[in-house]
Amino acid sequence: MAAPIFNTNTDALPVNPDLQKERASASFNVLELTHILDGGPEITKRRKELESLILSDPVFSNKDLLYLTKSEQYENAVLRSVKLVQWKNKYKWSPEDVAMAQRVNNSTEAITLHTDMFIPALQRLTSEEQREKWLPLALNHDIIGTYAQTELGHGTNLRNLETTATFDAATDEFVLNTPKITSMKWWPGALGKSSTHAIVLAQLVIAGNQHGLQAFIIQLRSLDDHSPLPGITVGDIGPKLGLNYVDNGFLILTNLRIPRENMLMGNASVSRDGQFKQLKSDKTNYSTMMYVRVLITKWAFGCLAGSAMIAMRYSAVRRQLYIDPKAEEVQILDYQTQQYKLFPALASAFAIFFTSQKLTSGYNQDLSSLIKGDKELLAEYHSVTSAMKAVCSDLMTDHIGTLRRSLGGHGYMMLSGLATVMLNSLTLVTVEGENTVLYQQTARHLLKQVARAMSGSVLTGSVAFLSKDLDNVPQLETPEDCRNVHLVLQLYQKMAKRVLIQAGTLVQTDLMQGLPEHEAWNKNQVTLVRAAKAYSLLQLVQCNVEGVDHLRTSASPGLVAALHRCCCLFALYYLNINAGLFMQTDSVSPSQLDTVRATEMQLLSEIRPDAVALADAIDLPDAGHKSVLGCYDGNVYERMYAAALGEPMNKSQVHPSYYKHLRGMIKGSTSKL
């Protein structure tokens, strides 16, 4: 290839002057916000130490990842996984260090499910004796595990999973089978080629009687040569939209025999003589799923925040067209339409952050009660984690798509980084429960709570608003009212309560008219999902308001003011999007909606001076985010050109296809001229 015509040494270039100007205009200390997002100054310091270690190692270079085949991507991910385990052992990393290292590496390892689901399942679903046996092996990576629940024919409907585990009293064993093509396990990450073991969800059968879904640990592959064991047929399911470095797999079980002790017996047990005993609520088996749904809210924040950072930096550097025809081309960040794409996305990221914080804190605080099988608490957490997983991943997906389009044509390039994030993060709307189904599960719980509230019960937790008298909440008459997030929050409560009551009334009316419950439910599905979404948005707004309020006594006034503006924008943006529900429930009037929209636009102009600083606080290192458009120095065009020169097709000036195909056509045509 010919020598570069333009400078490609971005390390020698100064920071783009437009970005320098943006950073100088910030009204708060960026590092202060970074500390909050990380969890404190010490955690930021630790993260940067891990970044320095990880991103300086050639194994974690992202330079040529786009050009790897699926098999090469997987091998690279395995290499990264092994390297992180080696460092964990060498440097005695804590679980928090491991989680942080995964985030630094954008979780581009092959066996994250080992840490995120296999180990938590061993911690939550086993007896003490089983934990002593299996947990050290998993923590030391002497075995590699996955969590095999979803089947080819059933994902959402767990009750109808078809894998069976039949107790053989003569041998004191369980015999596991996937009897039909739809019964095979399908989708678990790290199942195809990586894992040596799996926790399998199967229908327990004893003497012809079914005892529901139970968890079993099975060995998939030899610990000597990694070959599948007898009774195991396992493989990779093939290319996906994204995450092709993960070996999502299928698993067929044919008369696989395992010891009775391999049933995880923390919640239920089977004795030597075949007696089944339910020790805790059967819903406790789903505690691992709840945990992963909490994790998904964290991942949604990371994906959306990183995407917003990239789009914001690029929009500050990119100049195109004019606002004033007599002036120079303007930064596209100065266009109101661009701000309306970017600022609500960033505000949503902060709302998801505060929501995830509260959800994680509550889950950790209540974990012991959940493991003990507290039925009321399990029902509340199932509802809340379902709703928050769904709404956070929905918002993330919508905004990342908008952010990618905000980059114009360059956003279509994989080098933008956003295309990769968009494709990889799409899995979050279906993994651990398809969102529409999760909203329905939340709605079912909420209608029970509505009935309790209407009968006079005083509710607590996330449904406390159902017990409040919200009929006389003040209206949004002025721009100042619109900036009063506590007032706006009350209007969200009023809207959500009335929408839920309306949905419940529709179902109840159909039941009273003789419609069977399942038909009444199906007839009103869309309304019920809409009601659950209203509740979910309310929770996001409430967590956002509470999160900013909590900072008022500890953070600087400038930062609190900046986050307050984002909090206002988030609440008003989704009020505007859901204007129909707010008007339908008499929460706002059409004229008040005009005030809301005018305040939205004013907030865009107020956030504008802090936009880059708010995005910079996300603090993703250039070596980690895989984007030529979102680097800290803002040298977009030089990085794009340098990256294009690295395209393997450009290694030679004449592609082999010319000699194979084009030459004959061209020469044949020119001979006729």
Describe the function of each predicted region:
Residues 1-673:
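Flavin-dependent oxidoreductase catalytic core characteristic
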